[in-house]
Amino acid sequence: MIQMQSNLDVADNSGAKRVQCIKVLGGSKRRTASVGDVIVVSVKEAQPRAKVKKGDVHRAVIVRTKKDVRRPDGSVIRFDSNAAVLVSKNEEPIGTRIFGPVVRELRGRGFMKIISLAPEVL
């Protein structure tokens, strides 16, 4: 469950290390986002000479959360940290590599490019 002011790790090589959620997209009263949701983030920490700079505002897709993700078969999956992948306006990843596992739920949301770049899909 990601809400405004939540800090997330960045799971790609766009150059950002930490981002902060500044808006959950998908309705005016929507408060929280989960895996596969698109949020608006501000870059809080970035590598030097990278594609993105500190203070930049981008969209991001949540790929890992500490909060449980429930599957229809009753299984539960959770991670040690909250992580996101920065995407462009047309929801294409900014980076060319994805670090760490991502969840299968991204496939149903249409993020096939992220699924194909990820080293592991859980």
From Swiss-Prot:
InterPro entries xrefs: Ribosomal_uL14, Ribosomal_uL14_bac-type, Ribosomal_uL14_CS, Ribosomal_uL14_sf
UniProt-listed GO biological process terms: translation
GO molecular function, one term: large ribosomal subunit rRNA binding
Pfam families attached to this UniProt entry: Ribosomal_L14
UniProt function note: Binds to 23S rRNA. Forms part of two intersubunit bridges in the 70S ribosome.
Lineage: Bacteria, Pseudomonadati, Pseudomonadota, Alphaproteobacteria, Sphingomonadales
Gene: rplN
Protein keywords: Ribonucleoprotein, Ribosomal protein, RNA-binding, rRNA-binding
HAMAP family: Ribosomal_uL14
GO cellular component: cytosolic large ribosomal subunit
Family label: Belongs to the universal ribosomal protein uL14 family.
Tagged with keyword rRNA-binding: yes
Full protein name: Large ribosomal subunit protein uL14
CDD domains registered for this protein in UniProt: Ribosomal_uL14 (cd00337)
Subunit structure: Part of the 50S ribosomal subunit. Forms a cluster with proteins L3 and L19. In the 70S ribosome, L14 and L19 interact and together make contacts with the 16S rRNA in bridges B5 and B8.
